[in-house]
Amino acid sequence: MLISTLPLLLHEQLAQSTRMRVLCVAEKNSIAKEVAKILSGGRARPRNSLYKYVKNYDFQYTFQGLGPCDVTMTAVAGHVLTTDFGPEYAWGKCPPGRLFDAPFLTKPPPDRDQRAGILKNIIREARNADRLMIWTDCDREGEYIGWEIMSVAQGANPRLNLQTTWRAQFSHLEPQHIVAAANNPKALDMKLVAAVECRTEFDLRVGTLFTRFLTNIYKSKRLVGEKEVVSYGTCQFPTLSFVVDRYVRVRNFRPEPFWSIDLAVTKNGQKVNFSWSRNHLFDRMFVYVIYAQLLEGPQKPRIVGVSTKPTSHYKPLPLTTVDLQKCCSRYFKMLAKAALDAAELLYTAGYISYPRTETDQFPAKLDLKGYITKQTLSLDWGTHATRLLQGSFRPPRGGKHDDKAHPPIYPVKSASLDTLRPDQRKVYEFVVRRFLACCSDDARGLQTKVDLQWRSERFTALGLQVTERNFLDVYPYSDWKSLAQLPEFAEGEEVTPSSCKVKEGKTSPPNYMTEAELIALMDANGIGTDATIADHVEKIAQRNYVTRRKIGKSEVFIPTSLGISLIDAFDAILIDRISLLKPFLRRAMEGFLQKISRGEITKQDVISQLLPLYKEAFMESNQKGHVISDTFIQTSRGLS
């Protein structure tokens, strides 16, 4: 028996020795586990790595062009290398200004860092690998982490280089999609790597030197505690500036009185309010002169125009990361970071597509009806999904943005809401309803407009009847309701006012900044990316530059004395220089990073254009450092 099985055993050993060994590395252990499960058909064998929260999954898989391979799927937990200055440039070892020219070191984390175990695991698993496949998130940051993984693996095994490293392109964890990604890998995009390297080094250099400069000033005057850090960030300060600017506008607001003319006509027992074409005026006497002219003499108001025309309320665009954060903040009073964290968990669980995307147009090849079908069993929106498949489906609108990396956010598979945590439940329901709304028809209605002329003044009444709700049936976040139906008026008809009076009002102050408004401003001004905006907002709160406060039904940002003084001080110091507080420099940086990603410019091109501007601002600030401490003292007294 032993002799008869010997040739078979030798054949198996020979096959194993000739099989290629492929090391796959994901950005998170949850992704590694799911991808391994899919590619192995559920037969992956887990074993411990050198970091307790990451497992290694062994299985066999047939890659196109390689035949059957022995595969190990593992993961990292974000970046595996650190970029910093050398020890001679540590805090207290040199003046902050020297960091403008200090070289960078990219190195492994210290042994006490949790990443050390992850890095050692990559080194160990890479030693016997013939190929490396990167399964990090498919964005700029993920590409850079992929390059870090390759660099570490190459140090342990020179065979693993750009030629033998693949990059899996995927946006969700549906099995068919993951298999397609495994069978159609690409090369690492070193242009994206260069863009992240540029942004990392630039932000680290400028952020570190200004942070040390500010902290030294505040501590020298004992304005902050010994362990406190007054940090500067190229995105952080423009974000703070938006909040402070709004706060100042609210505090400095002085209401102004205005006057308007309200006219009402009653016909067939129905009162119809007409709006004055001038809206309101700030000259009380002039309004009363017009009012007196209207009332004198026998001339009656006359209907000069009646029209009824179809109108539409457009369905929403496909969902981007920024829109997800704004909507969750507005509709659910959820912090933007909490919304994004919940979306990340839904993605890693396979419920939605990758939630970090700037794209607001679905690719033509995406099987939209297939994903609608997966929602038909829902008790909450299944009826609407079924209706779409029975003939009500309409192609989604297309926006103007395509990041070329990921489609908009959409539901990949059905989920039972009862099994999800509260934040995840809200986000998942919103993603599904938004997707189904995108695949529905616009809401439709009839708008009636009646124009009335009375002497020299024009008044207008509007009516709206919603005739087809369509996407509104599944998307309760959009409000479009019928107004009172207007009675029939005829052009040329004279009417008798049932009331006409002068109404006095006052201008209203702007509201304090909400998170949804702040995110919209940051997005419009190029501050941060879809993936980082929430972090920048959270950071100004963590640094005690702003506080969150409930006013009425809204949670708003109120700047602290520290936050206000920082903005006021830099405004005063750099009054004739380029501002560190406005979005111009950061917007320019984001534009440059996109150009690096396309291969149009290099990192050095960006450094040579932008760094001198920050250097000039630093030199000016360094000479007038007393303004920073003086402003803080004055602001604190003013708010106390």
Curated annotation (Swiss-Prot):
Belongs to the type IA topoisomerase family. Disulfide bonds: none annotated. The active site is at Y354 (o-(5'-phospho-dna)-tyrosine intermediate). One of its GO terms (biological process) is DNA repair. Introduces a single-strand break via transesterification at a target site in duplex DNA. Releases the supercoiling and torsional tension of DNA introduced during the DNA replication and transcription by transiently cleaving and rejoining one strand of the DNA duplex. The scissile phosphodiester is attacked by the catalytic tyrosine of the enzyme, resulting in the formation of a DNA-(5'-phosphotyrosyl)-enzyme intermediate and the expulsion of a 3'-OH DNA strand. Mg(2+) 2 binds at D137, D139. Residues 21-175 form the Toprim domain. Mg(2+) 1 binds at E27, D137. It is an enzyme of class 5 (isomerase). Its EC number is 5.6.2.1. This is DNA topoisomerase 3. It comes from Candidozyma auris (Yeast). GO terms for molecular function: DNA binding; DNA topoisomerase type I (single strand cut, ATP-independent) activity; metal ion binding. Its cofactor is Mg(2+). InterPro entries: Topo_IA, Topo_IA_2, Topo_IA_AS, Topo_IA_cen, Topo_IA_cen_sub1, Topo_IA_cen_sub2, Topo_IA_cen_sub3, Topo_IA_core_domain. Binds two Mg(2+) per subunit. The gene is TOP3. The keyword Isomerase applies.
